[in-house]
Amino acid sequence: MKNTSTLLFAAFLSTFVPSLAAMPVADKAMFRAHLGFLADDLLEGRETGSRGYDISALYVASQFQKYGVQPKGDKGTYLQQVPLRKGYLQLDSPTMSLQGKNGDQPLVYMDEFLMGPSLLEDRSTKTAPLVFVGYGIQAERFAHDDYADIDVKGKIVVTLSGKPSRFPTEEGAHFSSGAHKREMADKYGAVGMISLQTPLSEKTSPFIKGREYRFMPSMDWINAKGEPANAVASLQNTASLSLTAAQKLFTEVDVSLDEIYALAEANKPLPRMDLKLSASMAKKSTISPLLSSNVVGFIEGSDPKLKNEVVVFSAHLDHLGMVKEKTGDNIFNGAMDNATGVATLIEMARMFNELPVRPKRSLLFIALTGEEKGLLGADYFARNPTVPLPSIVANVNLDMPILTYDFSSVVAFGAEHSSLKDVTAEAAKKAGLQLIPDPIPEQGLFTRSDHYMFVKQGVPSIYLWTGNTSFNQAEDATKIRAEFLQTHYHQVSDDLKLPINYDAAARFVQMNFQLALEIANAEKRPVWNEGDFFGDTFKK
């Protein structure tokens, strides 16, 4: 008996024009070879700026060259250099204490609070009063202002993680991001920030998980002024608190944190208040410069006019590297995250090289650095593109497609904000797949991968992922995906020993190849939907 997914894949191939014989087909053996190289222990986890990352970047560049993809990096090469600064936290240095009417109360690093390094100061210290500002969000579109009628100048703001539940999922992901909250705190003169875990955030991102990153550096790219592009000078003293420690901030006021949690759960307005406590924070950081590179390849379109419009396909090449302090397996290979995405780009490059007629619009393939450090390579490219920014009409981002099951659907985060939804649905249909809504909206994935840096430059963008359904009725796709996210995501076990389904991998490549054709050959360029929040917020 033939497998159902095999029959659907064959039906998908028959939809191609002009003929099946002339149309490239994804090769699972080629995909497997690329994945095997990129996720090998010899690359030591491909951390941004590392030897392993540089080797992987040269590998991608060599594959682009092999398949006739033109270089579009710096000075006629495939590499766009990204100047960086990295900082390590000196692990014996973080201290934090609360001061109130009962004197000084120290908190315990890693048990009660976590800090990251500074990229601006070797030594960072701050003592200031604490003020609670709800979620720390200002969103005029949703009639929400946590900074109304409260003075935070010269104070440390205390915020709940997350957002009001009434906010739409993807708009809410924008407002709940650390970048937005830091921007608001800086705007109103705060000198520090403390983020509090909530019962919801503890389920989706447990406080204890943060400990695992203590050996890893923070990074930012360096702008023309020689400064970290995204650092907020006034907020070098920030911390996150555990659920238990967070309770201690409300001992001097009439409202308990549990009552605030209850208000948040009921979607009611949160109080804003002086907490009648001060906090002292201190740390030391070791700071140094670093270089890494995006790998950029270009396929010129065939239409005399439309070739001046560019469709970007991106996938981050970096992962978490290795932790020398860890015994046993200490390499974060990042097989799913995101060697799969980059292997997809390379295999797409091969397929486009075999295409008899190039698509009408041009294509840009980018293997990005620094995603795990804060979407840095994408941010740098989007603000320093190697093609004119107005020429970029769309971005499709590939990040950690979970390929351990026989997926029968895809998710396109952000598709409902632009005309890309219909294009993606059509490509999925031709691939014998279903386009489904976000199955895990609580994760706020729309702002957590590289496509969002293109969104912030006004480019309609989506993040394409495998869905939570399977052609194999014996598989529980939802369970398989959840198990990967809970057990293997950002763990050393995300490696080649996973039960990777290479037929599914070929299907994912073919889906993206079809999507690239649909966008590049469409009569009209993608546009934001009328009145869309992201289109209106970031229009150029």
Residue ranges and their predicted role:
Residues 44-164, 292:
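Noncatalytic luminal/extracellular "stalk/propeptide" segments of secretory-pathway proteins
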Residues 101-102, 112-145, 149, 228-334, ...:
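Soluble metallo-hydrolase cores and metallopeptidase-like ectodomains found primarily
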Residues 20-73, 245, 308-310, 529:
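N-terminal hydrophobic or amphipathic helices/low-complexity stretches enriched
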Residues 109-229, 300, 330-333, 337, ...:
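Extracellular/luminal Protease-associated
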Residues 107-108, 221-257, 368-468, 472-474, ...:
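Metal-dependent peptidase/peptidase-like ectodomains
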Residues 23-24, 41-51, 120-121, 132, ...:
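Second-shell loop/turn segments in exported
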Residues 174-180, 201, 321, 327-419:
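Acidic/histidine-rich catalytic neighborhood of metal-dependent amide-processing enzymes
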Residues 350, 354, 468-538:
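His/Asp/Glu-rich mid-to-C-terminal helical/loop segments that flank catalytic regions of hydrolases
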